[in-house]
Amino acid sequence: MSLELKGIRKAFGATPVLDEVSLTLKTREFIAFLGPSGSGKSTLLRIIAGLESADAGEVLLDGRRIDTLPPGERGVAMVFQHYALYPHMTVRENMAFGLKNARVPKDEIGPLVDEAARVLEIDQLLDRKPEQLSGGQRQRVAIGRAIVKRPKLFLLDEPLSNLDAALRLRTRVELAQLRQRVEAAMIMVTHDQAEAMTLADRIVVFNDRKIQQVASPVEIYSRPANTFVARFVGSPAMTIAPVAMVDDSGAAKVKLGDGTVVQTGVPRDGLPPDDIQIGLRPEHVRVGKDGNGATTAKVELVERLGERSIIYGRLKDGLAITGEDIGLTDIRVGDEVPLTIDGARAHLFGPDGTGYHGQSA
């Protein structure tokens, strides 16, 4: 199975939503559409499903154009955020409903429902109604209703957003296990980066009507294409600040606003001459030992997370910076702490926001 999007454009009235979006999905690949609200990711999913029409562009499944077909003939199945289960029907009836509408023979419907229920481990729930199910169970029924159609492509519209934190984590694990048992590709829309990083083979980051980056979760995090991706992916967010270039040879050496010099691993060749910004992940800014550090920061907040502590501080020039310390840190708000900076893992960004990275990033 291959899905190809070619030059998709969409506007609602005078408001553009998607601008020349092109993408190729591979066989059995799990893709996450990640981005803020209003970035166009859900609209694109609905265009693939046939619930919205594109103003321009093409959608091809296995080389066959499907954007001219009605939703039921596209070979895709969509799982909605709000489950969309019929309350007066049992689980079995909900899962069989689409097959009956498609006039699938009755003697085929039962085995299809039973097999999907077995895969999802909800076979013991088939005679219950939605009101008798937990949120996670309802989500599995909604997925099961899609599975019985045996689609080439699953479309998941924020499938975990209605669940509480504990159930969301458990269902995320179940979804990861499910994709190993299902022979179809999947596209999931989410604004939750943890879901995208955990489940996806590749992440498509959206903003401002366009795709900002398409890459594996590791590459999205460690080699962001631009400042938007760098800030949007990662929690706490990356510290990004203007710097001055102080060395024109080899790897770039830059100076922060408080005078701290950072030797990066980014090759100087190819970098713009000025208007450079540095990007530092919190794990690459550490509290120094025995009072040693490249710079000092005044602590404004300490988040103790058990295995580590996140330190939010401010340098002498006023730059807000985020770093890490051990989980049992005794640092308090108002302390002046030394910080070490792992320059080899620092990122640099040009005037247009484009990212530049060293081999260690």
Indicate residue ranges for each PLM-predicted region:
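Helix-to-loop junction immediately C-terminal to a conserved catalytic motif
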Residues: 49
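ABC ATPase nucleotide-binding domain helices that frame the ATP-binding cleft
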Residues: 42-45, 141
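Short hydrophobic beta-strand immediately N-terminal to the Walker A/P-loop
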Residues: 31-33, 45
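Non-catalytic connector elements of ABC transporters
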Residues: 236-240, 247-361
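ABC ATPase nucleotide-binding domains
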Residues: 30, 37, 71-228
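Conserved ABC transporter NBD signature motif
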Residues: 57-65
